[in-house]
Amino acid sequence: MRAILTVLTALFVLLPYPAFAQNVLRIGLNDDPDALDPTISRAYTGRLVFAALCDKLFDVTPDLKIVPQLATGYEWSADRKSITIKLHPNVRFQDGEPFNAESVKFNIERHQTTPGSFRKSEIAEIQSIEVVNDLTVRFHLSQPLVPLLAALTDRAGMMVSPKAAKALGDKFGTQPVCAGPYKFVQRVAQGKIVVEKVADYWDKGAFAVDRIEFVPITDSSSRLASLRSGDLQMIERVSPTDLAEIRGDSKLKVTGVPELGYQMIPLNVANGPKSKALSDVRLRQALDLAIDRETLVKTVFNGEYIAGNQFISPESPYYDKKVPVAKRDVAKAKQLLKEAGQPNLSFTLVVPPERDRQEASLILQAMWAEAGITANLQTQENVTMLQSGRKGDFEAYFTFWSGRPDPDGNVYTFMTCKGAQNDQHYCNQDVDALLTKARQVADQAERKKLYDQATEIMAKDVPRLILWHRRVFTGFSTRVTGFTPYPDGIIRFRGLKLAN
């Protein structure tokens, strides 16, 4: 017996500790995230990784109420031109540095001053930041900013270690250090991103999974096969065509909630030489009129999604009923093309290698062809596509926006003249004024009037083709418990468990 115990003890010592202690959750992503730096990130899949890495000042509940995360509370001034935020005590960044008011000041200023920041326009009204004491910070605004708290529930509110950010500079996204429950371990491009639970996280008892691996698999069939085989335990943004297979597997579950965002095709209006193809508004209107959105949704997505043409879903109180999804009118589209002097319009549409958008682009190509329009389809990795969009190296590209709890987050950064994500360089001064004023008005009815006016102008200008609103489906193994779906599609790891 003593000999057997000796052998078992030796084996215990030789085997790596994780084989006994760690439980590893593997999540299949639709594509590889861009830089893991909240300031310059714009890819949706990056937000899924940040949910583990980077806590925010605020978060949302499943019913979209804004609640403190790294903050403990806040108070607006009477004129809503300053906000005082109390911070959680005893929080440290993953490098051991303390989280405090000074670090909040550093992060907000970093968002505002970093070249290429996508957060700058989200918090542009923050004029100065006052460190009241170690756990109290006050933002002074140039004018009221109603959607500020909503912005701080996402990347604008994510806090990174000032020490690490200063040391790494523009390479920070390769070795991110935040204040979340999981720390960065490794990234293999197009392979996986690995994070591990932080031993001294202030609320570590709420997180049961020891290690998370995010695995980009662009082909949805392969992603589903990996879930069914057990190689993955969760997959995000399940395609509607895969739902029946998941629902028929007793070892799997799927949840679905209406998304906050929309699927879209930005059209290059004025961003560099490639804008010439679609700079004439009549050509953009023709593209819009040649689309049958209802048929598109039924054909590609089995009717699981909602046809749309606005930056908010028909289920939102801000939806403008005066601008319904237009009926297809091929004759009118041809007339507009003729008036613009391009009866045989040809342009290039860049599409990422993801099944839903690949299949939708083929249907769109056929619809446009019936109006005499040639759409040349070009496949490009999602991150590369977004980088090309930033540079103006596109005529049109197929992307999406996952949506934000406040309507401002769905439109301001894309449609204002100096918006950080206005890749098409659309600029309408009336739209600018309306969207800017909507940021300052707290009354919902008054805000809706402003958004309605902007929506009606944009519907005529067609700077981007908004096509549908998804239901966000998440597939997962029955080994996974404690998962709660959110309308933003982001997986929260608090309370989530993985059975052996």
PLM regions with names:
Residues 28-78, 109, 174-178:
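N-terminal lobe/hinge region of extracytoplasmic solute-binding protein
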Residues 72-117, 132, 138-140, 226, ...:
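Aromatic- and charge-enriched surface segment that lines or borders ligand/interaction sites
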Residues 199-245, 281, 365-366, 374-376:
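Ligand-site clamp/hinge motif
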